[in-house]
Amino acid sequence: MKYKNIKRGIFIERPNRFIAHVEIDSVTEICHVKNTGRCKELLIPGTVVYIQKSDNPKRKTGFDLISVIKGSRHINMDSQAPNKLVQEWMEKGNLFSGITLVKAESRYKNSRFDFYVETKEDKIFIEVKGVTLEENNIAMFPDAPTERGVRHIKELCDSLHDGYKAYIIFVIQMKDVDYFIPNETTHREFSDALKSAYRKGVNILALDCVVEEGFIEIEKQVEVRL
């Protein structure tokens, strides 16, 4: 997945969840933050960030904040990227063979899952989560409590009883992590729900990514520790 019109900047501040002030070519610009998570460990004043200039002259903000440098690690922050990456990954023949249908944003009961996939043998629901939180080479999710995430997990479990297969895919938007864990400290209920789902037969995968200036792509599967 490639981004056009990428520029380097220096993060100044984040007045609210939706915008950031970034210094670009010695000028302070207002950028749209494509991630409403806290990201407090990433967006630190003085941090190098990469932003994308918008092609839409009518937008209130002329740039999108795409990625950030944390130490020696390049981390993509675009919350829209994980779904696109998983779709690209499946279209390349990874994960499932014999796919006959891929439908995004598919409703089941009270939830809307990211993907519904059919193969010659199976009907599958997939929920995708983007991961930007890393500590000591360990990737974690979530970075803030997510009741919606808990509901999705429980309804994925329900789908098993109706004959579907179910997957939760954590897209780690960086590389070189050792393994993935649920962030029990931040949201114990999510962690417990994920462990319960695994015991019931929901497939839990974590995939890391190659991240470069203006580029991100799924690389390989990472160990999940529950």
Swiss-Prot record:
Species this chain originates from: Ruminiclostridium cellulolyticum (strain ATCC 35319 / DSM 5812 / JCM 6584 / H10)
Family: Belongs to the SfsA family.
CDD domains, A to Z: SfsA-like_bacterial
Matches recorded under InterPro entries: SfsA, SfsA_C, SfsA_N
Lineage of the organism: Bacteria, Bacillati, Bacillota, Clostridia, Eubacteriales
Protein name, as recorded: Sugar fermentation stimulation protein homolog
HAMAP family in the cross-refs: SfsA (MF_00095)
Pfam families listed in its UniProt record: SfsA (PF03749), SfsA_N (PF17746)
Gene Ontology terms, MF aspect: DNA binding
